[in-house]
UniProtKB/Swiss-Prot annotation:
Gene Ontology biological process terms, A to Z: succinyl-CoA metabolic process; tricarboxylic acid cycle
UniProt cross-references to NCBIfam families, sorted A to Z: PRK00696.1, sucCoAbeta
Binding annotation for substrate: 264, 321-323
Binding sites annotated in the UniProt record for Mg(2+): 199, 213
Protein name listed in UniProt: Succinate--CoA ligase [ADP-forming] subunit beta
Organism: Orientia tsutsugamushi (strain Ikeda) (Rickettsia tsutsugamushi)
Substrates-to-products reaction catalysed: succinate + ATP + CoA = succinyl-CoA + ADP + phosphate; GTP + succinate + CoA = succinyl-CoA + GDP + phosphate
Keywords: ATP-binding, Ligase, Magnesium, Metal-binding, Nucleotide-binding, Tricarboxylic acid cycle
Cofactor(s) the record lists: Mg(2+)
Pfam families the UniProt entry points to: ATP-grasp_2, Ligase_CoA
């Protein structure tokens, strides 16, 4: 789960990470009051969306005039903000953060992630903080400092010293960085965060470290024990089909292709997407109905896939182990009739009750194409949408 910048800063502030004074605006009519309430000479107006690169897209503005700041915020509200991370479709701005400007001497980068590959928490830092950190990581990876932390021992002084030394921080700045790293580590553990980024972490003209921008991602599977974090969820920022799938307990990720996929099992789903690409087409989604789906869940999965306007055909690939193929067939028929499915549908069933499942589908009056194996299924659906 993602949250907005102002929410991330609220959490970091509770762990004593320094931030600039700011006010979140959640209603258009609160813009004037918020700007009047912020005691600063220079206003920074920030669009709040779940994507980076806002400055490039015009989502961050600076003004020394209160009235101009109000107009900038009002013009920003409701705009469709397109950044390198939103894609061409962009994201509608429905929240704004007004912040006091800081006097910057240097921009650093500091991040921490759950590093599954190395079974640890990895801190990353760089002296090249700012909007182009991704480019720095790609073109000059030596500029990214990495420190791996064993979760059994936790963060130790020597972990902080490695980053502090390589960043060239000394004196009070070194002490500030050590405190911030310790705070970020504690916050990541306590809130079930999977990623924390402070970019930039600035050094001000009076040598203070301040988190000028922040991004935090959380483990969806741990939200049941993080009610305060769950309250921060902004469903307007999420893909509505993915949100609908989450509520139906379905693993669904939307993609850019035109062939929808319904599969049981993540490995089989990956193989299905691979073979679609092998035949020259692109999958429109990853959808795993799981191993114990019932008729209603299968029907909802098909409705979600068919709700994507980019989908021109659907491939259902089921291997029945715990799941019975006749249950899949009944769910498919129920959904197809309800939504009056008009696009090509290819179904490959194997495993428990697969013959009964095929019989149910063949006895229906719907235009459903049966496939003998995965290769046959992929070929048929690609031909059908070509």
């Amino acid at each position: 789960m993602n949250i907005h910048e102002y929410q991330a800063k609220e959490i970091l502030s509770k762990y004593n990470v320094p931030i600039q004074p700011g006010i979140a605006i959640l209603k258009y009519e609160d813009i004037d009051y918020a700007i009047d309430s912020l005691a600063t000479d220079t206003f920074v107006i920030k669009a709040q969306i779940h994507a980076g690169g806002r400055k490039i897209g015009g989502g961050i503005k600076i003004s020394n005039d209160k009235n101009e700041a109000k107009n900038l915020a009002k013009n920003m509200w409701g705009m469709n903000l397109v950044t390198p991370q939103t894609g061409p479709k962009g994201q509608k701005v429905q929240r704004i953060y007004i912040e006091s400007a800081a006097k910057i001497k240097l921009e650093l980068y500091l991040g921490a992630v759950i590093d599954r590959s190395n079974h640890c928490i990895t801190f990353m830092a760089s002296s090249e903080g700012g909007i182009n950190i991704e480019e720095v990581a790609h073109t000059n990876p030596d500029k990214i400092i990495k420190v791996k932390i064993n979760i059994l021992t936790g963060i130790q002084p020597f972990h902080s010293r490695k980053i502090i030394f390589q960043l060239g921080l000394t004196g009070d700045l070194a002490k500030q960085m050590a405190k911030i790293m310790s705070a970020v580590y504690s916050m990541l553990i306590n809130t079930d965060a999977t990623q924390v980024e402070i970019n930039p972490l600035i050094i001000t003209l009076d040598d203070k470290l301040i988190a000028l921008d922040a991004k935090i991602n959380f483990d969806d599977s741990a939200l049941f024990r993080q009610p305060l974090i769950q309250e921060m969820r902004d469903e307007d920022e999420e893909d509505q089909l993915e949100l609908r799938a989450t509520k139906a307990d379905l693993s669904y990720v939307r993609m850019n292709g035109n062939i929808g996929c319904m599969v049981n099992g993540a490995g089989l789903a990956m193989a299905t997407m691979d073979i679609i690409k092998l035949y020259g087409a692109e999958p429109a989604n990853f959808l795993d109905v799981g191993g114990s789906a019932d008729k209603e869940r299968v029907a909802e999965a098909l409705k979600i896939i068919s709700s994507d306007q980019n989908v021109k055909g659907i491939l259902i690939n089921i291997f029945g182990g715990i799941m019975r193929c006749d249950i899949i067939a009944e769910g498919v028929l129920a959904a197809a009739k309800e939504i009056n499915l008009s696009i090509p549908l290819v179904v490959r069933l194997a495993g428990t009750n697969f013959e009964l499942g095929k019989e149910i589908l063949s006895n229906s009056k719907l235009q459903i194409v049966a496939a003998n194996d995965l290769d046959d299924a992929a070929r048929k659906i690609v031909e059908a949408v070509s």
